[in-house]
Amino acid sequence: PAENRVELADGRFLDYDYLVIATGPKLAFDEIEGLGPTGHTHSVCHVDHAVKAESAWQAFVKDPGPIVVGAVQGASCFGPAYEFAFIMDTDLRRRKLRDRVPMTLVTSEPYIGHLGLGGVGDSKTMLESALRERHIKWICNAKVTKVEAGTMHVTEHDEEGKPKKEHALPFRHSMMLPSFKGIDAVVGIEG
């Protein structure tokens, strides 16, 4: 940082006035046992994950059951969880399957529509209304503690962050947004 210079992999140096390292996030599936594409939930955060989720969805609609969708603690982008819930709801309705699929949205947000931003306009009321209209239940202030095949373990917290209720949510299909971390190459670099 003192020299405004970065060394490249081939040994060359690049001088700069301002340096932005835009790497995208590290998806921290490993923070929760059983989370993610190598565990028991799906992700849409990467093209490869979305392709796998689509394949699993096609199998799911042949033998539907409960869905758990949402964002775990440490996630910083909540909109895709709502969007994906509404996409699944719409597809299930078109297939005349929605009445056979209970849906629960699990989020670490303090309230529906917080979106990691303290809300956007009247997002709380609009999203609560949209979820109710679609018969999608929700759990806020949630911490996913473990995911097993067919069961998501969730601790619901009160406003002070104290555990309020334990949930063991059954699911046949789940898409959960993971925590986002800095990639290994830049974590711990000063400046």
Report the location of each language-model feature.
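Pocket-edge structural micro-motifs
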Residues: 10, 71, 156
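Glycine-rich beta-alpha-beta "Rossmann" dinucleotide-binding loop(s) and their flanking helix/strand
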Residues: 10-12, 19-49, 160-191
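Short, charge-rich binding segments
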Residues: 11-14, 58-60
